[in-house]
Amino acid sequence: MHKKQSIVIIGPAYPLRGGGMSTFNERLANQFLQENHPTTIFTFSLQYPNFLFPGTSQYSTEAAPKGLNIEVCINSINPFNWIKIGNKIKALQPDIVIVRYWLPFMAPCLGTILRCIKKNKHTKIICIADNIIPHEQKFIDKPFTKYFIKPVDAFVTMSEKVLNDLRLFTQKKATQVLHPLYDNFGEAVSKKEAQKFIGINETKHTILFFGFIRHYKGLDILLHAIKIIKEKNPNFYNKLQVVLAGEYYEDEKKYTTLITDNKIEDAIITKTKFITDSEVKYYFCAADVVIQPYRNATQSGVTPLAYHFNTPMIVTNVGALASNVPHGKVGLVCEPTAESIASAIETIFDLNYNTLIQNIQQEKQKYSWQLFTNTILHL
């Protein structure tokens, strides 16, 4: 039993749209509250200027999460605001500040806020590092990241790759812990109900590609894999449907052209919009398999969702993806090539589905929120 500690979490949260980090931060705050640690989230009034945001809207249309104290106050591009917010948190004297780091663009803002907090000589600053070296790199990344890291006391990562990247910048205390399961998207629904909600064929094998669509996530590789299946195994292709669920974060035309040129329109169902929290369960429960054909990755928020909803996975052997999906047990691991992905798609439907589900239910016991909070409190 830990002594009661006051906690501030700095990072995305409501009214910013759900998505990995907002959902994670809100669930983490709830866990600390369940363990009797007073917790407040400080989130962004402006996270990205519109010209830097590739989606349609940064803000949620859903109801505010119940029972959470969320201060909407950080402006990522206003240095006067950074000092004001840093001094406000400094005066609160929280025992622990937990700050998310995922993009060097945020380093000046977050690094300045942390320097202000540090002056109270009381608060321990712990960073949950989603990325240290971003997927798409720029020349400013290293100096910005160094600026952010300096006031941080300790780090938590959710993949070995991020931990190794961190070691290129600092030898401060750091530990790796598994990404806990998202269990705040509601209970599972029946496959029939889920497929009806989405409006898809209930007789076909359903593969789900879920999340924001960006180059590193390899959707183009998946589309080439579906073309290979059509050419080599037309009977299997006719039983297949691929649901693309998520908002484009780059040029949509690149993908729609691929679908048309590969003549696979009849197998692709596009739900290319932002998927709200209340809709998530329907997509995962409708799917027979969740696929992550990523070119590169650190960790993924899709894997914990698949575990939560007991959905088998196909992942590529990049970053931490493979280490979180035991091959042949809860899904398949393949190479990030169209040929390897096509083979994995054909193979997974030959495996015993009930055995995969049983293995998932056993494997997901490792992904605990209490383990995650314990790790933070022990740093």
Give a label for each model feature.
Residues 11-18, 30-87, 91, 162-163, ...:
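N-terminal strand-loop element at the rim of the active site
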Residues 150-189, 377:
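Donor nucleotide-sugar binding/catalytic pocket of nucleotide-sugar-dependent glycosyltransferases
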Residues 186-200, 232, 257:
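A short helix/loop element that forms part of the nucleotide-sugar donor recognition site in Leloir-type
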Residues 201-217, 223-226, 243:
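Conserved donor-binding/catalytic core segment of Leloir-type glycosyltransferases
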Residues 253-278:
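Nucleotide-activated donor-binding/catalytic signature segment of Leloir-type glycosyltransferases, i.e.
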Residues 282-298, 311:
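Acidic donor-binding loop of glycosyltransferase active sites
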Residues 306, 312-315:
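Short hydrophobic beta-strand element within catalytic cores of glycosyltransferases
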Residues 327-339, 345-352:
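Conserved acidic donor-binding segment of nucleotide-sugar-dependent glycosyltransferases
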